[in-house]
Regions:
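A beta-strand signature from Gram-negative outer-membrane beta-barrel systems
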Residues: 133-179
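Membrane-embedded beta-barrel scaffold of Gram-negative outer-membrane proteins
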Residues: 304-320, 363, 441-444, 470-530, ...
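Structural signature of Gram-negative outer-membrane beta-barrels, strongest in the C-terminal barrel
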Residues: 348-362, 367-503
Length: 673
């Protein structure tokens, strides 16, 4: 390690370590919701939920009520309602699900869980199937920079961030609150969920939740092999999954909040094989465990200064076995660890100007069970620093940020990946065209640098320590509007957003699945992505007790290989990127039984960058139907719900040779007190 770099790193670590104890009177972190701060001499009032039409960058928000009204059954299902998202899904409950946004790839999508970024130094991809919709209070996708500048530097280090906010704890109600739910469904699905929460005192609240999911996932599918058509059933796809959380929120003073979380996840599952020719045989098994603890503190230091601190330790294990491997059992296990800390200092000069400085440090390491897994026992020091300025008056909002990224790579054995550093600028603005109308134009630019993951650098046979990092540029121009008003008894509101974008990736690393656990990496070089996203949300309340909601979204993205004009792959669409995708939903709430119908679909995709003849994955469209009703008496509430997914039993694939389930049903009973 360079001596000058080492001194700078140690100095920054000392500064962060000094700030965190000083902030032992901090706030519970919350990146989706803006807060209201009363400062000496100035009052800064921000909305509880930032309106999507006012954001300087594309910002899509779904809250708990939206999940119920739109028939959302899991996090992946919710993301189908957001434009610009591409999901990779291996099918069935508990199947691995990853998210890419606007053609950038899943490694460029950050996932934030209750204000702290999740990490996976091995693959760089976050499996969103781990996070139960039953415990989620809100989902938000930010493409570019969020208008809330008081965030960790890591949260600004990706082109897009998916924020998951869990259910909020009670504030001053001293009574215990209990939620119990049971889900059963097709293909052996059974999933109980329980949550207990209570405000022990006016300043201390605790919550605990636990969930277990079992599924056979033995759904039928049709196998077509040239002229032969047979009815088959998915095999070797069983899963046992459980997760638990403990949460605490403590307010020692009027201006200080401390939050703590302990999290554990365990999934023991069989991995179904690729459907090839006449078989989908598989002997692969994977057990994944993840545990982390995090502490967040937030406090108002003086009239205009606020401080936030985060400390987190994360541990993850993946134990993979293939009992049908040629020559004997193939055993590949991995263990990764991360120590992470962050400090952010916010200065609110007045009602218009605000400035933030954030510094994050992380240490990651990874080791495998044998020399055939990860070579060299790599580790990495990461230092991220961001400086942000925001200006906001009645009609104009402007935001500028400069992010400094430093990655120091090493390995206990053998060669290591090179060290990397970069300055990444971003700027965005939103302007209200008419003072009396919610009509806005917005524009943004963001440059981001992504270091290769440990798999990309060190994986046996697939990784390379000489692999070039990815550099991305994204430009967005859009218009948003919202009209109408809503009262308790009647009203009509319409919200529309339209964004066009240009993205560029240099030295793009594209992952193509070799099987469900191992991916091969191909360095494409240059990629150009042109696209457009549109959303519409209409709410009509003709009279009390009746409401109709209509939602829709559409995405166009042309993600082209632009590396070499002489190559036969020049201008070809990148693997797994559909050119067109859409989603829609209609909900009718009434005094009897609420009903929702929804649908989504994509056009054809290629599973490889070479577009080999006969490998194209057909497009698909899927529809779902939901009926639900709630009954309340006193403090008690009982909810019943029936979901039918893939209503017309269409067979399709999101990942090549991994068929998705056909028509299925799910019954949920929930009790609250």
């Amino acid at each position: 390690m360079n001596r000058k770099i080492g001194k700078g790193l140690m100095l920054t670590m000392v500064c962060i370590g000094t700030w965190l104890p000083a902030a032992a009177q901090g706030f519970r972190n919350d990146t989706i919701a803006d807060r209201t701060h009363r400062l000496q001499g100035v009052t800064v009032t921000e909305e509880r939920r930032q309106k999507t039409v006012r954001s300087t960058t594309p910002y899509h928000l779904m809250e708990r009520g939206d999940f119920e009204r739109l028939g959302v059954t899991d996090v992946a299902d919710a993301l189908h309602r957001i434009p610009g998202i591409t999901l990779r899904d291996y099918g069935g409950a508990g199947g691995m699900k990853t998210v890419s946004v606007r053609g950038f790839g899943a490694r460029h999508t950050g996932v934030c869980y209750d204000g702290v970024m999740l990490s996976n130094c091995q693959s760089g991809e976050i499996d969103i199937s781990r996070y139960s919709i039953d415990n989620v209070g809100a989902l938000a996708l930010t493409i570019g920079d969020h208008e809330d500048i008081f965030i960790p530097a890591r949260q600004a280090s990706t082109p897009a961030t998916l924020s998951i906010e869990t259910m909020r704890m009670p504030s001053e109600d001293p009574r215990a609150h209990l939620t119990a739910q049971m889900k059963v469904g097709s293909f052996g699905l059974a999933s109980p969920f329980v949550r207990y929460e209570q405000s022990v005192t006016r300043n201390l609240a605790i919550a605990a939740e636990a969930e277990y999911t079992y599924a056979e996932n033995d759904y039928p599918f049709t196998l077509r092999n040239v002229t032969l058509v047979t009815k088959e059933r998915r095999t070797h796809s069983r899963m046992n999954e459980g997760h638990g959380e403990l949460n605490m929120s403590w307010r020692p003073t009027a201006t200080t909040t401390v939050g703590a979380k302990a999290y554990y996840y365990d999934n023991d599952r069989q991995l179904p094989g690729m459907v090839r020719l006449y078989t989908n045989l598989s002997g692969e098994n994977l057990r994944e465990r993840n545990a982390f603890g995090q502490l967040t503190v937030r406090t108002q230091l003086t009239g205009k200064w606020l401080l936030r601190g985060i400390a987190k330790y994360n541990w993850a294990e993946s134990v993979y076995k293939d009992e049908l491997y040629a020559g004997g059992v193939n055993d590949a296990s991995y263990w990764q660890r991360e120590a992470y800390t962050s400090a952010a200092l916010l200065y609110v000069a007045d009602e218009r100007w605000a400035m933030d400085y954030s510094a994050d440090y992380a240490f990651n390491n990874l080791n495998g069970s044998s020399w055939r897994t990860v070579v060299g026992r790599p580790y990495r020091h990461t230092l991220l620093q961001s400086a942000t300025v925001r200006y906001r008056d009645g009609r104009l909002t402007m935001l500028g940020r400069l992010l400094y990224s430093l990655y120091l790579n090493d390995a206990k054995e053998g060669p290591s990946a090179r060290n990397m550093r970069r300055l990444s600028p971003s700027v965005s603005l939103s302007y209200r065209l008419l003072p009396e109308r919610e009509l806005y134009v917005r524009a943004s630019y963001k440059n981001i640098f992504r270091s290769p993951t440990f798999n990309e650098s060190y994986y046996y046979h697939y990784g390379s320590t000489d692999l070039a990092p990815e550099v991305t540029d994204q430009v967005n121009v859009g218009m948003t509007m919202e009209e109408g008003r809503m009262t308790k008894d009647e009203g009509l509101t319409v919200r529309v957003t339209l964004d066009g974008y240009y993205n560029r990736v240099r030295d793009m690393i594209v992952s193509v699945p070799y099987n469900m656990f191992v991916w091969s990496c191909v360095n494409v070089g240059k990629v150009r992505i042109l696209g457009a996203d549109a959303t519409m949300n209409l709410r009509w309340r003709p009279r009390g007790g009746h409401e109709v909601m209509v939602t829709g979204n559409y995405s166009y993205q042309r993600a082209q290989n632009r590396t070499n004009p002489e190559s036969p792959n020049y201008n070809k669409q990148i693997a797994y990127m559909p050119e067109h995708s859409w989603g829609a939903g209609v909900n009718y709430e009434n005094p009897w039984v609420n009903v929702s119908i929804n649908g989504h679909g994509v056009t054809a995709r290629w599973p490889n960058n070479d577009h080999y003849a006969g490998t194209m994955i057909d497009g698909y469209k899927e529809f779902g139907l939901t009926a639900y009703r709630a009954f309340s008496w006193g403090r008690h509430r009982l909810e019943g719900r029936v979901d039918v997914k893939n209503l017309f039993n269409e067979q399709y694939e999101l990942v090549g040779h991994y068929p998705m389930p056909g028509r299925s049903w799910q019954l949920s009973i929930l009790y609250k007190i």
